[in-house]
Amino acid sequence: MNLGEFLYKLVHATEPYEFILHWGMYKDLLEEYQLIASSEKYTKNIYPMGLTDIINQNNTDFIPYFMSEKIFFLDNNIIHTMLNNEDVQVPYDYSIMLDTNYTSYIKWFLNGRNQPHLLENYMNLFSSGEDKFTVSNPKHLAVYENLYYVELFKSIDQKKYVECNKLEYTISENEARQNTDRIISLFYSGNSKEILNKFIDLHQSMTLLLIGIWQIQFGSKASAKNKMKKLFKYVIDKVGIFYEREMVIALRYLEDTKAVSMLNKINKGGKSLNQKELLEKVENIAWDFIVPRVMEFHVNTNKKYSYFIPFFLSHDKKLKELIKLFNIKGMLLHRKKDEYIPFSNLDTTDFFDKKGLFNELKTLRENEILLKREMVHEENINNNFSNKVKEIKTLHEILKK
């Protein structure tokens, strides 16, 4: 028995009792694990009252991470308690992530003024390697203001606003500034810097992958299947990391470009961009692609205290569509290690097999190729992903033809 077999069974499970049955079969292997899973056959909706109605509205800005509001939790202690016919008390909490443009709406809401602060402000701050934060830097000030207004927004007296339509805060403006100062100082502490570096590496790898997708889409007249074979090779040679959900999305795009509107932001015949502008545009799209992985990180970091249910709030239609393209059914988390494995309702091995790409997927997992991919990824990190300059040049030339 191994973890891969267990996850395969979870992908195909539909009834809550099936999850419990599979857990029981693998309980010795799962001693240090806990599970968050969703099933339409489960009877309980764990979302706050009214939120499901909001999520189900057309053009809603609320995007849930999990594919259903019918969510349950499992670990060996929960199973043991259930078998003893005792009440199961499971602590869980919620978090709402905002896209950075949404924070400008908050400032407008609180102040009646709108000064949009785009995602690149955050990227410039946290990926630039700067060791000092100062509000005399306009880009730093933009980030500070966004965080400050979010702190105020979080402290709105809900009862007063609902009953009297009046904005009052449960903290002072000075307390909001102090909270913001603490957040900024956390970003510059050793541990937080290490975490941010992981996200920056992830973002740069995603940038490389996206460049490869567009190189192949616009540089080849092959079928979607053969384009995908080229992309598998590109992953081995240039990226190193195999991003499963993004490769599924890439194939859907290569089969039908209309299926992934986010990837249509780069196209032939559009506005002429120089290489620097093109790279900046690709990097901004890459930030959107890693949103689900940031949500997963928050689920993992809070696992010691409670099960965590994340949501994302955005007014960007293409970003909302992108997040919904790969339904997350659940997540398996290790209690002590930094290990978490999200899984969907899609059997990706079967998916690629039916598309005639099983051999390419199998090749990725061969020991020799695994070693090569690891070396490619390490080299990318050590060279600060300098190869993206060459790859963006290639893409730029393809788009000009």
Model region roles, listed by residue range:
Residues I309-L322:
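Extended hydrophobic secondary-structure segments that form protein cores and membrane-embedded regions
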Residues N2-F308, I323-K401:
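Active-site-proximal, substrate-binding regions of enzyme catalytic domains
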